[in-house]
Amino acid sequence: MKRLILTAAALLCTQAHAGAQHLIYPLETAVIQDRDDALAYVQSRYPQTGTLALLDTRQSLLGTHYHFAPQNDAGQPCEGAIVVTTDRQGQLYRLFNSLPDDTADCVLNLPLPPRPHTLLSPPAGEIVQATMTVFDPDPRTATGLALEGDHADVDDIVIPASAYQTVTGIEVTRQNGRLYLVNDRVMAVDIQSMAALETGPEQGLVSVADGSSFAFTRQDTAFRDVNAFYHLDHSLQYLAALGFTGVRALFTAPLKIDAQGQNTNNSTYLTDTGILAMGVGGVPDSEDADVVLHEFGHAINYQLVPDWKGGDSDAIGEGFGDYWAGAYSFWVQRDRNERFELDVFANWDGVVGALKSRRSLNDQEARYDPEMDYRAHVSVNGTLSDQLWSTPLFQTLKQAEAVYGEAAFDEFNRVVLEGMAGMGFGMKMHDLARSTVDAAQRLYPQKPYAQWLNARFKHHGILRDALVLAQSNSALTVTGKNQTELSLALIQSGASALNNVQVDLAMPALNWHQVVRSELVAAGAVTRVNESVSIPASLQCGETLSLNAEISFSQDTAQQPVNYQQELTFTYGVPVLSQPLQHSQQAIPDARQINQNGKILLGEALVALNVPAGAGLVSYDFAIQLSLSHPRFSDLKVTVRAPSGRSVTLLNYQSFPLPEKTDTFTMANTAGLSELLGEPMTGNWVLEVTDRVTGQSGKIHSWGVGAVTGYDCSQTGTSTDPQNKQTTDNPAKPENSSSSGGGSLGLFSLLFGVVMALARRRQF
């Protein structure tokens, strides 16, 4: 076994990512029973913090969270936070730290005072049960019908009777012979006046005679109050059923909602007054449970995190609201054979009428840039901020439901809510993603929720391994007598230096094992690694090889170590296709901004390849070879279009840490390629590369399509028939292909070559 020591001098660096990690998992143990213990611990660990003020103490399913805010010399609150999190036994578990370096000149974070307003509120009385008529969750989902209607006037849309549901046992208040929409959880109010709000119509208090039901339809304005009241009450009861009750209760007083609170096509949770004000422009928002529950999602955010502000919190809040609404629509349809538009948020309010605004819960092209702050409803580098957070959550919920059925809803919703507990001012998506994966592992260690979440967050670039090994070429060639050249790179992509690094590498097929150790690996370090390795006599040309790596490091010497595994796959020998490669050296134009408003014109490169007659049909041995270079692969989408017009995406804005990539895409390692089975090979094939982010350009070096006829495993260019090789590609493990760009490890002797990665900041 070789032992390789990385020296600090060999790993020169620049900062790769601008965003620092706010989550800290201390090595030391401490018992914290109350706010005084928490404050004493913080001041002992961070003596330079100065004066801290306790904002609040919150309890969640897994422990207690003490939220502190920094203050300046005048006692005014500053932007920043430190949250001390303990487990259920009061043992220190984690810190969230976004404290400013200096509070003398800090940016103030003053609480917003309640704006002047007047409300009409229902009276107190006796709690009784009533019957209501509602949309559950909306008329399109309830019926599975489009119901597009007349775009000019939504009031003319014909709603079938089957769109309405009768619900019973709903708690309301009885007073003086009438029933009002108020109970211990929800209060339907009427905003009569409010500063800085374009208030909606004054509908008064909705009530019915004792013994009657709230049986309205959408032609009655009272239906809006009833529908919103029901869905908000149902969701609040669901929170309690998940375990957020007693000392863990998120809401301790009735939540106020005005179903016609705004005269615009917009709804808002007013944080200063604690009121949900629903809009009436276009389709009245209260008719769509998605919109009601989305706004309720904002209220949940502020109850879980008292200083929900700064960083990516705006976009996270929008994404969580979409998720919370989508999860309920999914639950309503859980027993249906055919589910209606699961991946669409607001598919009633956002679809019908002249004012359309629906969002996707399945934006697989959304990618995260840690150097940017994500606001609400904005596009960053081609990614809508709301969808960037909702997509990994909702798609993991679908994955969980497919495996565990109805039980997955409660379990996964607990994970999502618990993940937010303990966050603080200035949280970034990668902070919350890490916390959510952590919550999944702690709540359900026997189920793969954490693994699934981790994979989806990595797909979107929200989570990234701080230390990765990457290969620029997936094929191992023969470089000398019984020798192959392994060329890889060790990349430190974190925002700060890593301590006590150890990488255990193993490639069993080559009888090779190494351990790489370093006390310090600086941020942004890229170390090129090359080694000639002997080829065992038993190795067959065309065989698939795996390189496994176990990685361990600490963010600093006072934190718990991070441990994870990576894997790379190689092919021994270069695959030979039935059709010759096209060597194009075609430039990939950079995207460019074309006006003052930040509108982006995509950069596009098209390369055609003609396959002559007699080439046969696409079969299971079909492959696409591609070699291209680009400083930032996350800018690129690479698609191949067959002569029939059917297309397959090879790279989809996925991050890749090296500037060059040569790979062979096969049925086994590329999702979607099997859709081309049976297609004629003859005709024009088109490679299309799209760049959606300004700042970098690249080049297509070569590409080709065809059946794999053999593997070139010699210096003379002879090839081996794939039918004679001993080991073939494993179709059960397509995620291990290097085309994923995720990177596993392979490292041999160290011939250091340092690449400086300059930090960048782009603004849209």
Cite the ranges covered by each PLM segment.
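A cross-kingdom C-terminal cell-surface attachment/processing module
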Residues: 746-764
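Loop and turn regions of beta-sandwich accessory domains that flank beta-strands and are enriched
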Residues: 463, 538-540, 569-737
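Juxtamembrane/start-of-transmembrane alpha-helix segments at the extracytoplasmic/lumenal side
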Residues: 738-747
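Zymogen propeptides/activation segments of proteases
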Residues: 18-292, 299-320, 326-574
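Gram-negative bacterial Sec-dependent N-terminal signal peptides
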Residues: 1-17, 754-755
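Disulfide-bonded cysteine-rich modules in secreted/extracellular proteins
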Residues: 469-471, 582, 743
